[in-house]
Amino acid sequence: MNKAIFLDRDGTLNIDYGYVHEIDNFKFIDGVIDALRELKKMGYMLVLVTNQSGIARGYFSEDQFLQLTEWMDWSLAEQDVDLDGIYYCPHHSEGKGEYKEDCDCRKPKSGMLLQAIKELKIDPTQSIMVGDKVEDLKAGIGAKVKMNVLVRTGKPVTGEGEGIADYVLDSIVDLPRILKRLKK
């Protein structure tokens, strides 16, 4: 069984400008790539789990999302960071057409994490969810991951978020240091 870091995207890995779907508007948060590289060296799989309601709302197409995701994946790979899995939810209960759905994959539900756990043979009791919203943490809790980490690089941290997070960090950049300290 593998251990993994489940990663939200917008506000965790990249600056959240709102419905980011174009390469020109995608900017990694300072230090994120180095942190991801360090987490890989520590033996963690890196698994992206991202809600993309902009697809359901008609703000951008699934093809536009996939094009940006492919670019992001290549950008990381060029810097020795390989994502082991990419999972996304294009649905929203108030969406349009085929994407209007109250699904099991949209965080705070745990469907994306549970699918990754099954497909990638991940041990949730050795794994971590990192995100900038309560919904991210609730998905991690529902999937029974070992640790849920809230980062301050996206949405404002709420009291509810602080209450359910195992750690609240300024950025994912701080996570490798915390994990090394806990290992001692």
From Swiss-Prot:
> Where found in the cell?
Cytoplasm
Q: What is its main location?
A: cytoplasm
| Needed cofactors | Mg(2+); Zn(2+)
The UniProt entry's sequence similarity note says: Belongs to the GmhB family.
Assembly and partners are described as: Monomer.
Q: Which GO terms describe its biological process?
A: ADP-L-glycero-beta-D-manno-heptose biosynthetic process; carbohydrate metabolic process
Residue positions binding Mg(2+) = D8, D10, D132
Alphabetically sorted, this entry's keywords are: Carbohydrate metabolism, Cytoplasm, Hydrolase, Magnesium, Metal-binding, Zinc
PANTHER family according to UniProt:
D-GLYCERO-BETA-D-MANNO-HEPTOSE-1,7-BISPHOSPHATE 7-PHOSPHATASE
Superkingdom in the source lineage: Bacteria
Which gene produces this protein? Answer: gmhB
- Note the site residues: Contributes to substrate recognition: R106
Sites where the protein binds substrate: D8, R9, D10, D16, Y17, G18, Y19, T50, N51, Q52, S53, R106, K107, K133
Catalytic activity annotation: D-glycero-beta-D-manno-heptose 1,7-bisphosphate + H2O = D-glycero-beta-D-manno-heptose 1-phosphate + phosphate
Task: Indicate what this protein is called per its UniProt record.
Answer: D-glycero-beta-D-manno-heptose-1,7-bisphosphate 7-phosphatase
**Protein's pathway:** Nucleotide-sugar biosynthesis; ADP-L-glycero-beta-D-manno-heptose biosynthesis; ADP-L-glycero-beta-D-manno-heptose from D-glycero-beta-D-manno-heptose 7-phosphate: step 2/4; Bacterial outer membrane biogenesis; LOS core biosynthesis
Where, by residue number, is the active site? D8, D10
Give the GO cellular component terms, alphabetically: cytoplasm
Q: What does this protein do?
A: Also catalyzes the dephosphorylation of D-glycero-alpha-D-manno-heptose 1,7-bisphosphate, phosphoserine and fructose-1,6-biphosphate in vitro.
UniProt EC number: 3.1.3.82
Q: Which residues bind Zn(2+)?
A: C89, H91, C103, C105
Locate the site labelled Stabilizes the phosphoryl group: T50, K107
The broad enzyme category this protein falls into is hydrolase
Give a GO molecular function annotation for the protein: D-glycero-beta-D-manno-heptose 1,7-bisphosphate 7-phosphatase activity
